[in-house]
Amino acid sequence: MWVAVDAMSGDYGPEGIVEGAVLAVREFGLSVSLVGDEQELLDILLKFDYDTEKIRVIHSTEIIGMNDSPSIAVRAMEDSSVVKAVRLVADKECIGVFSPGNTGATMAAALLHLGRLPGVLRPPIAAPIPREEGPPVILLDAGANVDCKPEYLAQFAIMGEIYSRELFGVKNPKVGILSNGEEDKKGNTVSVKTFDLLKKIPFNFVGNVEGRDLYGSGRDVDVVVCDGFIGNIVLKATEGLAKSIFNVLRNSIRQSSLAQTGALLLKSTFTAVKKRLDYAEYGGALLLGVEGICMIGHGSSNALAVKNAVRVISECAKHQINERIRERLGEYKTILGDSN
């Protein structure tokens, strides 16, 4: 089972990405195609003990930057690492692809070379959000589609429910719509119409949920649906707040010798909390609804994130996520309609 990894598009160069690929091969027995500058990647690989039969390097000469126009770049830079990595999936050489680069470019390459699954109106980005207890809440759309129709959001709910159940083992995922109140008629026109659609689908729809419910502080919910404009703001705000809290805590500890002593006693607790809130534990966010499996990572993805991204991609293949999506959307086609 081969997974393609765009090794060149991260913020900090390819070394951490290569290390993550080596760890995935070593710990999970998977195979990885690293796409990027061949000589540079081979030089980095010399630093590690790895199975040469399970890691290969695919040469590419271009890198799509964070400031490049996605739609233009994926066509003009066909030898870029992200495009070549996606094409390995399109050519059936790999079961999925991970890129820590330009999100828009990864999406554009996936749509251009992989295409949508039959019946999918718009592919959403599904981001795992850590909460107080249990598996993460799946937030979608986390940035792929800033303007959505109710039919899009209803499909997002179905795809997110499958992701939560198959990958995180939630037996009967609770699905909610992110809104400005729990009452049935709260929200804008799109969310109210989406509410009516989701009531018709035979799954565990719990109605409207509020922002606090994402983190386990309010209503119990496993999948939260919104458009990509709101979802991306929520995702970035969540990441920023978590980082800020850790910084405040660290700075406060440094100001007092007593606090430093207490911190030493609580070191294992702090480590456990950090691990629970670390995005790297989930690898990245899946672009659901495309042929093949596509995961988008942070530009700052480290070796742990890459290792887990490769693992999650392989688990998606084992659990036949795309087959489940295809089946469920087919079942509910009369409810969801065919609005493009």
From Swiss-Prot:
Main location: cytoplasm
Record pathway: Lipid metabolism; phospholipid metabolism
Alphabetic keyword roster: Cytoplasm, Lipid biosynthesis, Lipid metabolism, Phospholipid biosynthesis, Phospholipid metabolism, Transferase
Highest taxon of source: Bacteria
InterPro entries linked to this entry: FA_synthesis, Phospholipid_synth_PlsX-like
GO cellular component annotations of the record: cytoplasm
GO terms for MF: phosphate:acyl-[acyl carrier protein] acyltransferase activity
GO biological process, any: fatty acid biosynthetic process
Top EC class for this record: transferase
Catalytic activity: a fatty acyl-[ACP] + phosphate = an acyl phosphate + holo-[ACP]
Gene3D superfamilies linked: Isopropylmalate Dehydrogenase
Subcellular location: Cytoplasm
Summary of subunit composition and partner proteins: Homodimer. Probably interacts with PlsY.
Record function comment: Catalyzes the reversible formation of acyl-phosphate (acyl-PO(4)) from acyl-[acyl-carrier-protein] (acyl-ACP). This enzyme utilizes acyl-ACP as fatty acyl donor, but not acyl-CoA.
Name of this chain's protein: Phosphate acyltransferase
